[in-house]
A protein has these predicted regions:
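Histidine (H) residue identity feature
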Residues: 18, 46-48, 60
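Short, non-transmembrane amphipathic alpha-helical segments
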Residues: 20-23, 59-81
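Low-complexity, polar/amphipathic intrinsically disordered segments that mediate membrane, lipid-surface
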Residues: 2, 94-98
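N-proximal, solvent-exposed amphipathic alpha-helical segments enriched in charged/polar residues
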Residues: 1-36
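Short edge beta-strands and adjacent turn/loop segments
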Residues: 27-54, 89-94
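A short amphipathic beta-strand at an alpha->beta junction
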Residues: 75-95
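Short acidic, glycine/proline-enriched loop segments that cap or flank alpha-helices
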Residues: 8, 54-58, 62
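Flexible domain-boundary/linker segments
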Residues: 37, 41, 66, 80-83, ...
Length: 98
């Protein structure tokens, strides 16, 4: 195959969800990613992550951090034409003091 030829490949919705979930879990204050969905429309990746957060966390900052980490991972690994990521804080976890 010539290096200048176009090379077509696809990344499944399952793989996109896994990339976003793995990256999102790295954000401080995330206890779990409860659900996630992914779809690709005309080259634009649409993702939704539902997060269980640690009680007392800055929820706005946490959601932005999850969104940014997921976006950076998807951009680096997939290079989509466009990216739309939404984050919902679905639940809070009260964890015992350390």
């Amino acid at each position: 195959m010539d290096e200048e030829q176009d090379f077509a490949y696809a990344v499944s919705a399952k793989a996109l969800r896994h990339i976003a979930e793995t990256a999102g879990r790295q954000a401080s204050g995330v206890v779990a990613i409860r659900s996630r969905s992914a779809a690709v429309t005309d080259g634009v990746v649409h993702l939704h992550l539902a997060v269980r957060a640690r009680y007392g966390s800055d929820l706005h900052g946490l959601a932005l951090d999850v969104q940014q980490r997921a976006a950076e991972a998807i951009d680096a690994m997939v290079e989509p034409e466009g990216l739309d990521i939404s984050v919902t804080i679905e639940d809070l976890a009260v964890l015992p003091a350390e």
